A protein has these predicted regions:
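Catalytic domains of carbohydrate-active enzymes, especially glycoside hydrolases
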Residues: 1
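Metal-dependent polysaccharide deacetylase catalytic core of the NodB/CE4 family, i.e.
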Residues: 5, 9-100, 119-132
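C-terminal domain-boundary segment and adjacent tail
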Residues: 12, 60, 91-96, 100-103, ...
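C-terminal beta-strand-rich structural cap/linker in extracellular carbohydrate-active enzymes
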Residues: 228-248
């Protein structure tokens, strides 16, 4: 299953609301792209505010899920209007890479490899697959691209924009207090973001010569640990209690 972000501008949506809800129910993110796609630089703030809120309300009413990200119409990020768009969001799209008629297997693979090499996040954006603006000349090229990304899942994490934006924000805001003892670590996380908005678990990596066995517990629950030759990896709750790590 490949989850994606669908950016909806409701006044011109070419899907029924039942189809949009079906996508949402299957785990795809439905994001806000403005009710009438109003360019922030060309309309008064009150019209921009209405355009954003009206789309939020329509998406929530028809899917049951409030959009927590925003995609700027025409990529215009006028500062005063941007202050409205970011309210009650985990993030807004400030960069993207267009994927469509000009995409080749080579430049798509190069893009992904560069993201891996530079430890960066990438936001792929396509308007249409088989028809519409900048649609693929051969739609199979897009599916092949997804298969290539899937084959690299040990090196790359693919998530919806909401998931990735929340993760990045949480990672930057989380403080870890670490006490090292013999064959034991006590790690206390602290995160003060809005836990109703920022709900992603974080991943902790312990690097070094691998032990035969590593176990981790938080709030009385065992945390699944992935062991590699040079590191151990596990997810944890940044709002939770002390993480006890035993190294054997």
């Amino acid at each position: 299953r490949r989850q994606r972000q669908m950016c909806i501008r409701d006044s011109t949506t070419r899907m029924s609301w039942s189809q949009v809800k079906d996508l949402s129910d299957r785990g795809h993110e439905i994001s806000n792209h403005g009710w009438k796609h109003k360019n922030f630089a060309r309309f008064p703030l009150e019209e921009i505010r209405e355009d954003i809120y009206k789309n939020d309300s329509a998406i929530f009413a028809n899917t049951g899920v409030m959009p927590r990200t925003f995609v700027y119409p025409n990529n215009n990020k006028k500062e005063e209007a941007k202050k409205i768009a970011v309210q009650n969001r985990v993030g807004t799209r400030t960069k993207q890479r267009s994927i469509g008629s000009k995409s080749t297997p080579q430049n798509l693979e190069s893009w992904v490899n560069t993201l891996i090499e530079t430890n960066d996040w990438g936001v792929g954006m396509t308007h249409g697959l088989t028809y519409g603006y900048d649609a693929f000349r051969n739609p199979q090229r897009f599916w092949d691209h997804l298969d290539q990304v899937k084959a690299k899942e040990d090196k790359i994490w693919v998530g919806t924009f909401r998931e990735v934006a929340a993760y990045v924000e949480e990672k930057g805001a989380t403080q870890l207090d670490i006490v090292c003892e013999k064959n034991h670590l006590r790690i206390t996380p602290e995160l003060t973001l809005d836990k109703e908005l920022f709900i992603e678990p974080l991943t902790l990596v312990i690097k070094g010569k691998q032990k035969k066995k590593i176990s981790a517990r938080q709030d009385g629950k065992k945390l699944p640990v992935q062991l590699h030759t040079d590191k151990a990896v596990f997810d944890f709750n940044p709002y939770g209690g002390v993480i006890e790590v035993n190294l054997k």
